[in-house]
Protein backbone atom coordinates (compact mmCIF):
# COMPACT_ATOMS: atom_id res chain seq x y z
CA UNK A 1 0.00 0.00 0.00
CA UNK A 2 1.34 3.41 -0.92
CA UNK A 3 3.32 2.24 -3.95
CA UNK A 4 1.04 -0.10 -5.93
CA UNK A 5 -1.13 1.77 -8.43
CA UNK A 6 -1.15 5.07 -6.53
CA UNK A 7 -3.58 6.50 -9.10
CA UNK A 8 -6.11 3.89 -7.86
CA UNK A 9 -5.19 3.37 -4.20
CA UNK A 10 -3.41 6.62 -3.30
CA UNK A 11 -0.05 7.10 -1.63
CA UNK A 12 -0.99 6.43 1.99
CA UNK A 13 0.93 3.52 3.48
CA UNK A 14 -0.53 0.82 5.68
CA UNK A 15 1.15 2.52 8.66
CA UNK A 16 -0.49 5.85 7.70
CA UNK A 17 -3.86 4.16 7.46
CA UNK A 18 -3.48 2.39 10.79
CA UNK A 19 -2.45 5.64 12.49
CA UNK A 20 -5.53 7.45 11.10
CA UNK A 21 -7.94 4.67 12.09
CA UNK A 22 -6.47 4.40 15.59
CA UNK A 23 -6.83 8.16 16.01
CA UNK A 24 -10.47 8.00 14.89
CA UNK A 25 -11.15 5.06 17.23
CA UNK A 26 -9.63 7.00 20.12
CA UNK A 27 -11.79 10.04 19.38
CA UNK A 28 -14.86 7.78 19.33
CA UNK A 29 -13.84 6.08 22.57
CA UNK A 30 -13.69 2.59 21.09
CA UNK A 31 -11.05 -0.11 21.39
CA UNK A 32 -9.43 -1.21 18.16
CA UNK A 33 -7.54 -4.32 17.18
CA UNK A 34 -5.68 -3.98 13.88
CA UNK A 35 -5.05 -7.00 11.68
CA UNK A 36 -3.62 -7.28 8.17
CA UNK A 37 -2.76 -10.34 6.13
CA UNK A 38 -2.25 -11.37 2.54
CA UNK A 39 -3.30 -14.96 3.31
CA UNK A 40 -6.89 -16.12 2.98
CA UNK A 41 -6.65 -18.76 5.72
CA UNK A 42 -5.28 -16.25 8.21
CA UNK A 43 -8.10 -13.88 7.25
CA UNK A 44 -10.69 -16.61 7.91
CA UNK A 45 -9.12 -17.36 11.30
CA UNK A 46 -9.17 -13.66 12.21
CA UNK A 47 -12.87 -13.44 11.33
CA UNK A 48 -13.61 -16.56 13.36
CA UNK A 49 -11.76 -15.03 16.32
CA UNK A 50 -14.19 -12.08 16.32
CA UNK A 51 -16.94 -14.17 17.92
CA UNK A 52 -17.22 -13.15 21.55
CA UNK A 53 -14.25 -10.80 21.21
CA UNK A 54 -15.53 -7.89 19.11
CA UNK A 55 -18.77 -5.96 18.79
CA UNK A 56 -18.09 -5.22 15.13
CA UNK A 57 -15.47 -5.09 12.41
CA UNK A 58 -14.23 -2.71 9.76
CA UNK A 59 -13.11 -4.88 6.84
CA UNK A 60 -11.18 -4.38 3.62
CA UNK A 61 -10.92 -7.85 2.13
CA UNK A 62 -9.07 -6.45 -0.90
CA UNK A 63 -9.13 -8.93 -3.81
CA UNK A 64 -10.64 -11.59 -1.52
CA UNK A 65 -13.79 -9.44 -1.65
CA UNK A 66 -14.46 -10.74 -5.13
CA UNK A 67 -13.43 -14.36 -4.74
CA UNK A 68 -13.52 -15.77 -1.23
CA UNK A 69 -16.38 -18.01 -0.24
CA UNK A 70 -14.32 -19.03 2.80
CA UNK A 71 -14.27 -15.47 4.17
CA UNK A 72 -17.97 -15.09 3.37
CA UNK A 73 -18.74 -18.32 5.23
CA UNK A 74 -16.68 -17.14 8.21
CA UNK A 75 -18.75 -13.95 8.46
CA UNK A 76 -21.96 -15.96 8.12
CA UNK A 77 -20.84 -18.15 11.01
CA UNK A 78 -19.74 -15.44 13.45
CA UNK A 79 -22.63 -13.03 12.86
CA UNK A 80 -20.57 -9.99 13.86
CA UNK A 81 -21.75 -6.73 12.24
CA UNK A 82 -19.18 -5.30 9.86
CA UNK A 83 -18.67 -2.46 7.42
CA UNK A 84 -16.90 -3.30 4.16
CA UNK A 85 -14.42 -0.59 3.12
CA UNK A 86 -12.45 -0.12 -0.10
CA UNK A 87 -9.99 2.62 -0.98
CA UNK A 88 -11.11 2.59 -4.61
CA UNK A 89 -14.64 2.56 -5.96
CA UNK A 90 -14.84 -1.15 -6.78
CA UNK A 91 -18.16 -0.57 -8.56
CA UNK A 92 -16.45 1.65 -11.14
CA UNK A 93 -13.58 -0.73 -11.84
CA UNK A 94 -13.13 -3.66 -14.19
CA UNK A 95 -16.02 -6.18 -14.23
CA UNK A 96 -14.30 -8.82 -12.07
CA UNK A 97 -13.90 -6.27 -9.25
CA UNK A 98 -17.49 -5.00 -9.26
CA UNK A 99 -18.99 -7.91 -7.36
CA UNK A 100 -18.50 -8.31 -3.61
CA UNK A 101 -19.11 -11.65 -1.94
CA UNK A 102 -19.44 -9.77 1.36
CA UNK A 103 -21.60 -6.71 0.62
CA UNK A 104 -24.94 -8.40 1.25
CA UNK A 105 -23.70 -9.53 4.68
CA UNK A 106 -22.26 -6.14 5.67
CA UNK A 107 -24.25 -3.47 7.49
CA UNK A 108 -22.83 -1.11 4.85
CA UNK A 109 -20.20 -0.62 2.17
CA UNK A 110 -17.97 2.42 1.74
CA UNK A 111 -15.91 2.56 -1.44
CA UNK A 112 -13.98 5.16 -3.37
CA UNK A 113 -13.09 7.68 -0.68
CA UNK A 114 -9.48 6.59 -0.22
CA UNK A 115 -8.14 6.50 3.34
CA UNK A 116 -11.01 8.73 4.53
CA UNK A 117 -13.34 5.80 3.91
CA UNK A 118 -11.94 4.01 6.94
CA UNK A 119 -12.91 6.83 9.28
CA UNK A 120 -16.33 7.06 7.62
CA UNK A 121 -16.76 3.32 8.00
CA UNK A 122 -15.70 3.30 11.63
CA UNK A 123 -18.08 6.15 12.51
CA UNK A 124 -20.92 4.41 10.69
CA UNK A 125 -20.19 1.11 12.44
CA UNK A 126 -20.08 2.73 15.88
CA UNK A 127 -23.37 4.52 15.14
CA UNK A 128 -24.99 1.26 14.02
CA UNK A 129 -23.74 -0.59 17.10
CA UNK A 130 -25.15 2.20 19.26
CA UNK A 131 -28.60 1.48 17.80
CA UNK A 132 -28.60 -2.08 19.14
Task: Annotate the PLM regions.
Residues 68-77:
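Short Gly/Thr/Asp-enriched flexible loops that form oxyanion-binding sites at enzyme active sites
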Residues 50-57:
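Short acidic/histidine-rich motifs immediately flanking catalytic phosphotransfer sites
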